[in-house]
Amino acid sequence: MPLDGYRTEGFIAEGLFTSQDEIDNSPEQLLGTVVRPGDIKYRDINGDGRIDNDDKAIISPYGTSPRIQYGIGANLRWKNWDLGVFFNGSAKRTIIAGNITAFGTNDYNVMQFVADRAWRLDNPDPNAEYPRLGLTPADNANNMETSTYWMRNGNFIRFKTLELGYSFKYGRVYLNGDNLA
């Protein structure tokens, strides 16, 4: 059981539908909208020929808290000079990127980088970074389900702090930077 008592449950994505023929020959997805080419295709876990809440599985054993959080630092001195560095990060963490407003805000504005990387009729890329974009939340319902399609690796390490200083007899001058990389 995860430390925070939470596991991520959702559908297992099998890519994007590339044609109406593929949709017609796949298990029926009963997720509140008409499925179209470019929509996310989900696995029929229980084999009943339809995709519904009974086909959800634990898609990440990690909850909202990373399993490992770490930091490492060093302070060096040489004559009147000093240098301090600190790195921190987390590991064993999965994030779900489905809520990054890929489908627009309440005004339905879509960021250009999303539109450029989405599945479109004029560019039917089966490996598109984003599924087909619809006009309304109801039109996007199939693609807004929590699934492995939206899972991302949440591990990171960052260069948190750098400080370089020089000490005088009665004081110290230093430069400090935070969140450098």
Question: Predicted regions span which residues?
Answer:
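Active-site beta-strand/loop architecture of penicillin-binding DD-peptidases
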Residues: 55-57, 64-68
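Hydrophobic, lipid-facing positions within transmembrane beta-strands of outer-membrane proteins
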Residues: 68-74, 81, 159-164
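A generic beta-sheet turn/junction motif
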Residues: 76-80, 89, 168
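Repeated loop/turn-to-beta-strand initiation elements of outer-membrane beta-barrel proteins
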Residues: 80-84, 171-172
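Acidic carboxylate motifs that coordinate Ca2+ or other divalent cations, activating on Asp/Glu
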Residues: 44, 48, 52
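Extracytoplasmic gating/loop element in the C-terminal half of outer-membrane beta-barrel translocons
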Residues: 2-27, 33-37, 90-178
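Outer-membrane beta-barrel domain signature
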Residues: 59-63, 150-153
